[in-house]
Structure formats: C-alpha cells, structure tokens
Amino acid sequence: MVKYFSENLSDKNSIIKQKILELCMNSGDFSIADFARELNCSVPTTTKIVGELIDDGWLEDLGKKGSASGRRPSIFGLNPEAGFFVGVDLERNHANIMTMDFKGQTLSYDEDVEFTLRNTEDSCRKLCGLIRKTLEDN
C-alpha cells in the first residue's frame, strides 16, 4: 500500500521526495549518486529519502547496473504498482477509456465504449460506473 507524503509540502524532505519522483517520471531510473548529483543533495540524505520512498511503495530497487570498473551501483525506479492513471475521452455517443500504471505503461484501452453524453446526474453516474468497471478489470 502506498503511503502519502507529508501534509507540509514545504518540508525539505517532502520537496526532495517530489523531485526524485519527477526525475524518475521524466528521465527514467537513477542510482543514489545520480539522484544526489541531480538534486545537489548529500548522498546520505538521498539514501535515506530513497529508502523512505521504497518503504512507502513509490520506488523499487531494480538491481545493480553493469559497470566497466568499480562497484556496480543499485538502480532505483518508479514502482509501477504505486498507482495508476485513467484517461477518459468523451464523445457524444461513446467514450474511450485508457488506464496506465505509475510508470506510464498502458494497461488497457477500451475504444468506442457505448455511452451517451448528457447533462444529467444519471449520465454522470453511468460514466462513473464505466470508469469503475475499467478499474476493476485491471
């Protein structure tokens, strides 16, 4: 189960956690040294925060990276099961619904799902039902 960040987003550690997740989302996987260099942060602080992100379910240890010489660093990346995203494209007479894991990999894409768009509570409930069904199927 993924835990939430601190309510106080100005907290230095929360800011660093957000930046680590942004780096992984935008640029892929990193070693502790890479994170520390990108964030201009000490290696011990980075190690502690990456450990917390792993414990909270946001990141995972992807193993050792091959290296020509020296000690091989551990690589860390987003945990694809940390959460997912749902995109809904509404047309007048159908909907397209896509789900993606936390790493951005497509889990499902349901095209031309029967749905009539109306400005009513019932239409909204039906749309929520379609989305819920898509989530349950994944």
Model-derived features with residue positions:
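N-terminal helix-turn-helix
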Residues: 29-62
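Electropositive phosphate-/nucleotide-binding environments in soluble metabolic enzymes
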Residues: 10-14, 18, 43-47, 121
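Gly/Thr-rich phosphate-binding beta-strand-loop-beta motif of the actin/hexokinase/Hsp70
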Residues: 70-109
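N-terminal phosphate-binding loop and adjacent alpha-helix
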Residues: 109-138
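Extreme N-terminal segment that seeds HTH/winged-HTH DNA-binding domains in transcriptional regulators
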Residues: 1-37
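Short secondary-structure capping/turn micro-motifs that flank functional sites
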Residues: 40, 69-70
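Short, basic, alpha-helical segments at the C-terminal edge of helix-turn-helix-like DNA-binding modules
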Residues: 63-69
